[in-house]
Structures are given as structure tokens and as C-alpha cells.
Amino acid sequence: MIQAPRIALIAGEASGDHLGAGLIQQLRLHFPTAEFIGIGGDMMRSAGCQTWFDTTELAVMGLTEVLRHLPRLLKIRREFCKRALAWHPDVLIGIDAPDFNLTVERWFKQRHIRTVHYVSPSIWAWREKRAAKIGASVDRVLCLFPMEPPIYARYGIDARFVGHPMADEIPYQTDRATARTALGLPLLSPVLAVLPGSRHSEISQLGNTFLEAAGQLSEHLPGLHVVIPAANTQCKPLLAEQLSRSTLPVMHSHLLDSSARTAMLAADVVLVASGTATLEAMLLKRPMVVAYKVAPLTYRIVKTLKLLKINRFALPNILAGEDLAPELIQKDCTAPALCAALLHWFKHPQKVTALQNRYLQLHTQLRRNASTRAAEAIAELLQQR
């Protein structure tokens, strides 16, 4: 029975650093004298992990960025593997970032070291056969969504549903008034939150259309306030430029530095790009309209090759197995269509109440004390040695 395990972790993104810190805190309850090393950020270091590389050194996005940084990424991988193997870990835990982590995990598994992958890739959406590669790389997968373990079971892979950390963080009942006060918004006016994505390419595709829809909505809802949280400093100038060309009243338009959660909390309705933000809006119990648009050639390739297995894009709809939030994709993503879908929520409060009750059911399903369950699954694996 291992009393003081050596645990290596790799968090390739800021969200992974957050997950890693919570996991370390819970693992210490099982193993008070455990040692932790790895790749992480400030939160993991504060939790007691000795980091050999920082999470920011792995955080590159897009094919061209990856290619430009590939030599450095490969060097980090080589150095980490060499040092970690010499350190003799009892388990290696890769947190999300599958492009980097699965290769490292497989390398360690081949050397008879237990490996765990925390946060399953979206095999339920596309490229399900990746599950076989994942199974060759890890001893156990820790999943955030309940529909994931049954897919792994078809491939004979040990996968556990631990719940979603965001569902643990967000309370069942949320406070709109406090959020509005924090943003300087009137308590009784209609408020729309606009989130066209976090990447430059997403905002280029969706930003103008979203703002045009908000402008049209303001004609139906006098006194409408629109809050636009910039996901990061890189995308704020583009949003500011798009906003300057929109028809939105200047006095009622609010471009924010980050604060996406506060913006959604303050809003009556959310207009959001398909992605993780839809899950956050659901957990905050906000009615939403979901949209997405990619380059026409990309969309044709995806459709022709049948790369996507799903007929729904928004996470709340996928989790519910029904269309709770309107989805407007590609050619259907027009300002008039978005405006009409948004106006529907503003004009039908009884439907909003019914929707919020359904969102509460999904929230309850996802709230499982994820860090606690993940730590239990890892502790169990360690005791099997």
C-alpha cells in the first residue's frame, strides 16, 4: 500500500491549472505526505506542486502557432519525460491538452507507470475512434460528462464520470442584482450579454452579426443594455472596432475586460458562440441563443467527410438530448434570425422559468464534487499496484 506516492501532473492550459490545484488539494486528504511535480501554473504551485515548466509554455493555439513553436514544445516534452522518469513517479496525470498529454502518457505507460487522463477529449462529437488511442495511453480516464464513459466502455477502457468542476463552483441560485450593481447596470432594464467567442477567427465570423442582431433587438426593447465581455486582451481591439461600426446606442453598450461570468449573471438573455460558454450560461440558468459560423470551405469538408457525429452543437442541448436553446449555424446565423430568437426569450417569461427548471436538473446531474471524485479514482488506482 502506497503511503507517500510521487505524483506527476501536466496542465497545458489555464483551466487545467485550476483543475490540477483542486485535484492536488483532494489527493492530499488521501496521501498527506505525497509529493507533486509537473507542468502547471500559479494555482498548482500554491497547492504544493513543484513545477518544472509553466503552463503558459504549452499554451499555443491554432495550426500555425503550433508549427512555429513545435521545436520548443518537443524540447519541453523530452526534458520533462527524462526528468520525470528519473524521479520515479507512481502515477502521471495529464489534465486536458490531449495533443501534448496523450503522447507523454503513452510513453510513461509503456514504461509501466500508471497514467490517468483528466478531461476526456470530445469523442462523443467527432473522431470517436480516438478512444482506442486514448486507451493505449492511459489506465483510466476521468470524464466531466455522463455520456462519455459508455463510449469508452465500448472499447474496453476504464473511464469514470466525476462531474464538472464548473457545476461545483456555480451555485444553484444566482444573484442578478449584485452582478448588475458590479457592472453599473440599472436593475430593471432589459440586459443582453453578447459573447461571440474567445478566438480572433470566431469574433471575425460572428462579432458583426451578433452586434447587428443586438442593434435590431434594441429597436424592440427600448432601454436595452448590451454587455460584451472581451475574453482576452488580444480580442478586445477587434470587438471595439466592430462595436464602433454597429447601430447600438453608445450609452447602452458596455465593452468589458473579461468578466464573462458577471456579464452573463447580469443578463436576462445571452447570445453566445457555441462552446464552453454555453455550459456556463446553462449553469447560471440564463436563456440563450447559440450560434456558430466557420469558413464555408471548412464547413463543406466537415459535412462531406461526416466528421461530426452530432446533430446538436450546444452543450446544454447535447446533455439534455433536446433543443433547449435555439442553434443558428452557418447560413442560418443571420442578424434577423438571431434577433427573433432573442426576442422570444424576452417576451415569454413563463418559458424562461420552465427552461431554468430544466437547466437546474442538468446542473444537479453535473454537480458531483469533481475534484473529490477524481482524487478517489486516482487513489483507488494507486492502491491497485
Swiss-Prot record:
- EC number(s) from the headed UniProt entry: 2.4.1.182
Annotated GO CC locations: membrane
Superkingdom as given in the UniProt entry: Bacteria
* Catalyzed chemical reaction(s): a lipid X + a UDP-2-N,3-O-bis[(3R)-3-hydroxyacyl]-alpha-D-glucosamine = a lipid A disaccharide + UDP + H(+)
**Which GO biological process entries does UniProt record here?**
lipid A biosynthetic process
Q: Which molecular function terms from Gene Ontology are attached? A: lipid-A-disaccharide synthase activity; phospholipid binding
EC category name: transferase
**Which UniProt keyword terms apply here?**
Glycosyltransferase, Lipid A biosynthesis, Lipid biosynthesis, Lipid metabolism, Transferase
Pathway participation: Bacterial outer membrane biogenesis; LPS lipid A biosynthesis
Supply the Pfam families for this chain.
LpxB
Question: What family is it from?
Answer: Belongs to the LpxB family.
Summary of the function given for this chain in its UniProt record: Condensation of UDP-2,3-diacylglucosamine and 2,3-diacylglucosamine-1-phosphate to form lipid A disaccharide, a precursor of lipid A, a phosphorylated glycolipid that anchors the lipopolysaccharide to the outer membrane of the cell.
Under the heading HAMAP family, the entry gives: LpxB
- What name appears for this protein in its UniProt entry? Lipid-A-disaccharide synthase
